[in-house]
UniProtKB/Swiss-Prot annotation:
The keyword DNA-binding applies. Belongs to the bacterial histone-like protein family. GO terms for molecular function: DNA binding; structural constituent of chromatin. Keywords: DNA recombination, DNA-binding, Transcription, Transcription regulation, Translation regulation. It comes from Hahella chejuensis (strain KCTC 2396). This is Integration host factor subunit alpha. The keyword ATP-binding does not apply. This protein is one of the two subunits of integration host factor, a specific DNA-binding protein that functions in genetic recombination as well as in transcriptional and translational control. HAMAP family: IHF_alpha. GO terms for biological process: DNA recombination; positive regulation of metabolic process; regulation of DNA-templated transcription; regulation of translation. The lineage of its organism: Bacteria, Pseudomonadati, Pseudomonadota, Gammaproteobacteria, Oceanospirillales.
Length: 100
């Protein structure tokens, strides 16, 4: 199973929407720039029928170096989380049911 890349998305826009290749690549880049910009300004990103990207603050917690067993603190940080929407969940579940 492969991975969907930004280049793949641009190619689909080129083939299905009729944009030229440069415009298609720019549109994909612009989309991801908007998502990054919104998240960097602490905004939630809601994509109807797909899901939501949220920011979550994680507190500092104790961790352990797997090689030495030494306890080390894992610093507090902000992470991006994704929660799939109902339509995406249903599509994935339907697809998973067709696998053998």
């Amino acid at each position: 199973m492969g991975a969907l890349t930004k280049a793949d998305m641009a190619e689909r826009l080129y083939q299905e929407v009729g944009l030229n290749k440069r415009e298609a690549k720019e549109m994909v880049e612009a989309f991801f720039d908007e998502v990054r910009d919104a998240l960097s300004h602490n905004e939630q990103v809601k994509l109807s029928g797909f899901g939501n990207f949220d920011l979550r603050d994680k507190k500092q917690r104790p961790g352990r170096n797997p090689k030495t067993g030494e306890e080390i603190p894992i610093t507090a940080r902000r992470v991006v989380t994704f929660r799939p929407g109902q339509k995406l969940k249903a599509k994935v579940e339907a697809y998973a049911g067709t696998q053998s």
